[in-house]
């Protein structure tokens, strides 16, 4: 009798372990979050800092910025919901770029895009390169 109870117990565990538990966030709604407000740009050397006010949304997950790094590359930067700044880095020139900033919630819904224009200053590598001088060392 004990053997039948034990076998039934083991069989129950085997059946229960065959199902895969759901991992991840389920889609909770189809309502997009509000757009960011008061977007301001601080242009830095080879980069830019965008500050903003977060929208009031309970399931806001992150803020995403999309911009064209050069002719061939479209880049994205993301910032956590726990900060109000987004940094765009790695810009090798001083050309103006349009950045599209959207808020994304846990369901993947995106807000209306807010367009900001950044004008990065001269990158540090170009400033240092201009000041370098190459001279022979030993001869």
Regions found by a protein language model. Name each.
Residues 86-114:
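Beta-strand-rich modules
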């Amino acid at each position: 009798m004990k053997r039948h109870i034990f076998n039934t117990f083991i069989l129950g565990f085997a059946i229960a372990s065959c199902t895969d538990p759901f991992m991840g966030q389920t889609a909770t709604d189809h309502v997009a979050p509000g757009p960011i407000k008061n977007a301001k740009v601080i242009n830095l050397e080879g980069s830019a800092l965008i500050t903003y006010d977060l929208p009031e949304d309970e399931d806001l997950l992150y803020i995403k910025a999309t911009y064209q790094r050069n002719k061939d590359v479209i880049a994205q930067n993301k910032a956590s919901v726990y900060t109000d700044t987004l940094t765009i880095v790695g810009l090798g020139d001083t050309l103006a770029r349009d950045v599209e900033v959207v808020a994304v919630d846990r369901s993947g819904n995106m807000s209306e895009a807010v367009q900001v224009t950044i004008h990065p200053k001269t990158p540090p590598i170009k400033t240092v390169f201009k000041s370098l001088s190459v001279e022979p060392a030993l001869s």
